[in-house]
């Protein structure tokens, strides 16, 4: 089940939990989404500042599996 987190500190606490398995980082042109998979919930944090996103990426726990996903350009047909 998905849950959205608004605070960076709260996200880091969730990422350091024992049941946190992996983090997916989705980069879009307007924002960066961090998704941490825990046993019960998938916690999502949306950051619009690219510098804060890089700092958060560096402060993730080292034992956690991190996967980066870049956005695709959507094809708009007239």
Swiss-Prot record:
GO terms of molecular function: structural constituent of ribosome
InterPro entries reported for this sequence: Ribosomal_eL38, Ribosomal_eL38_sf
Keyword DNA damage: no
Segments crossing the lipid bilayer: none
Ribonucleoprotein among keywords: yes
UniProt entry keywords in alphabetical sequence: Ribonucleoprotein, Ribosomal protein
GO biological process: protein-RNA complex assembly; translation
Gene Ontology CC: one annotated term: cytosolic large ribosomal subunit
The family this protein is said to belong to: Belongs to the eukaryotic ribosomal protein eL38 family.
Name of this chain's protein: Large ribosomal subunit protein eL38
